[in-house]
Design a protein with these regions (language model features):
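A short, amphipathic alpha-helix used for macromolecular contacts
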Residues: 1-34, 78
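Generic structural signal for small/hydrophobic residues in well-ordered secondary structure
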Residues: 5, 20, 38, 88, ...
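Acidic, metal-coordinating catalytic cores used for nucleic-acid/nucleotide bond scission
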Residues: 16, 27, 93, 141, ...
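Major-groove recognition helix of helix-turn-helix-like DNA-binding domains
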Residues: 33-47
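C-terminal anion-handling pockets and recognition modules
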Residues: 37, 80-82, 204-266
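RNase H-like two-metal-ion nuclease catalytic core shared by retroviral integrases
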Residues: 61, 168-169, 176, 192-216, ...
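Extended, low-complexity cationic-aromatic segments
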Residues: 66-151, 252, 257-266
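RNase H-like polynucleotidyl transferase catalytic core
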Residues: 108-115, 183-203, 219-220
């Protein structure tokens, strides 16, 4: 019976213990009155509750490994007059983002719905060594906002000889305007492009998640201006100020994601 149960779970991937309990009752005539008891049985059989990861079809494990090795080589050889930053864009929307939380059993929780769904466009970068950030609010994220951000990074580090910037392969990051700007005499920025479809290799993606946890989850802002102010204040001021507490959540502890290591669901 236990082997049949394991085979059922492996094949059907049921989403709830109720489904599993119904299978056990239907096939073996056994009724589990206690959900905890059923969960204990599943654990004893080597079964766990999983949330599938989202894995890109075009992920290239070899390119990821080469990128990680190249990044580690650069970090290990980094001079005192150099810095490394990670760059990306984010588009927070002025909307309620409810998440689960503990509360008294008798209370019903709610978040006031916002009147609109305006979003803000932020082009930003972070230095993992210091927690320093530069966040540019823009009408659109494009080559112009990229150049504004790169200029802000040079202003942030006026005495460094080289600023290494890691970023994704968005078209505007490769734009002719950006290339022309980089070619100007005296520029001190070198771009390093992260392999395609690999947001897990850009730590600033984790910063966006931390931002939502602290600013948007289970919170309501009366106006889009108030919302934008809180988001930008967190990214520009609170992240550097609280970097010792936040740094463990925003790291360059990279890993290779290979689709071959997963059972990809159809």
């Amino acid at each position: 019976q236990e082997e049949a149960l394991k085979a059922y779970v492996a094949s059907a991937l049921p989403r709830s213990t109720r489904q599993i309990g119904a299978f056990i009752e239907r096939e073996f005539g056994v009724i589990y009155e206690s959900r905890a008891g059923l969960i204990a049985l599943l654990h004893r059989l080597g079964l766990e509750y999983h949330k599938p990861e989202v894995v890109g079809r075009k992920l290239d494990a070899e390119k990821q490994q080469a990128f990680i090795e190249g990044y580690e080589k650069l970090r290990n050889a980094l001079g005192p007059d150099e810095a490394v930053l990670f760059l990306d864009a984010v588009h927070p929307t002025h909307a309620a983002r409810p998440v689960g939380c503990w509360a008294p059993k008798e209370e019903k929780l709610a978040i006031e719905q916002t009147s609109g769904r305006q979003r803000i466009n932020i082009h930003g970068a972070i230095d993992l060594e210091t927690g320093q950030t530069r966040m540019i609010e823009a009408e659109t994220i494009d080559a112009a906002s990229t150049i504004r951000l790169l200029e802000a990074l040079e202003a942030l580090y006026p005495f460094l000889a080289m600023i290494h910037v890691y970023l994704d392969n968005a078209r505007y990051h490769h734009a002719k305007l950006v290339q022309e700007w980089l070619a100007q005499p005296g520029r001190r920025i070198k771009l390093h492009f992260i392999p395609a479809y690999c947001p897990h290799l850009n730590p600033i993606e984790r910063l966006w998640g931390v931002m939502h946890k602290h600013v948007t989850h289970n919170k309501c802002y009366a106006t889009s201006r108030e919302f934008a102010g809180e988001v930008l204040s967190f990214l520009r001021e609170k992240v550097p100020q609280n970097w010792p507490q936040l740094c463990d959540s925003i790291t360059d502890n990279f890993r290779v994601i290979d689709p071959k290591d997963f059972r990809v669901l159809a």
